[in-house]
């Protein structure tokens, strides 16, 4: 967060100001609009090694109605939403199919987010209706296996993403907002 938000984005937004002379010809320096490549690239690289690859492994080892897959998908959408908001178009729908993967437009990525969240919410709602037992409580450091909290988080994420597109695709945003706030669990 510090490197990618505060020391990169916040400097450009003038939340911070350098207290030194400008170095136009010198080394990389975010204060002088010569970005440290590592700071700028690390969120993108980490998203694929620490979010997408583990998600893909879970998908390959679970079935479509697995609560584990649903939870992993919610985490993936949360992580990748920040990446597409920061970088714009990203490799998403074809991830894992090769080295040179086409980039998806932000519209396509957001639409895919909504589909994936809807599917994950359906899986977790089905699980929650069959049992009140926590799911993988021992391994869930966020909600301790409380599936209804994951459903609420997924709907909150769905609402957040819908608000992000509300000025560019009002109809889709309205549909997703209604689905998020109309869910029986929250």
Residue ranges and their predicted role:
Residues 19-75, 79-186:
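Structured, solvent-exposed acidic/aromatic patches
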Residues 1-17:
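A short, exposed helix-loop element centered on a Lys and neighboring polar residues
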């Amino acid at each position: 967060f510090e490197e990618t938000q505060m020391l990169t984005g916040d400097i450009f937004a003038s939340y911070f100001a350098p207290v030194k002379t400008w170095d136009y010809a010198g080394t990389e320096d975010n204060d002088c609009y010569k970005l440290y490549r590592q700071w700028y690239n690390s969120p993108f690289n980490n998203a694929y090694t620490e979010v997408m690859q583990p998600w893909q492994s879970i998908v390959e080892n679970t079935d479509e109605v697995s609560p584990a897959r649903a939870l992993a998908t919610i985490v993936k959408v949360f992580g990748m939403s920040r990446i597409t908001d920061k970088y714009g178009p990203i490799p998403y729908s074809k991830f894992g199919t090769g080295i040179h993967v086409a980039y998806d437009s932000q519209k396509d990525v957001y639409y895919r987010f909504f589909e994936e969240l809807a599917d994950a919410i359906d899986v977790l709602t089905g699980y929650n209706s069959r049992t009140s037992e926590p799911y993988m409580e021992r391994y869930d450091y966020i909600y301790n296996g409380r599936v209804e909290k994951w459903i609420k988080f997924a709907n909150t994420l769905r609402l957040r993403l819908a608000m992000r597109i509300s000025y560019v695709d009002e109809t889709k945003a309205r549909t997703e907002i209604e689905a998020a706030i109309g869910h029986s669990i929250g």
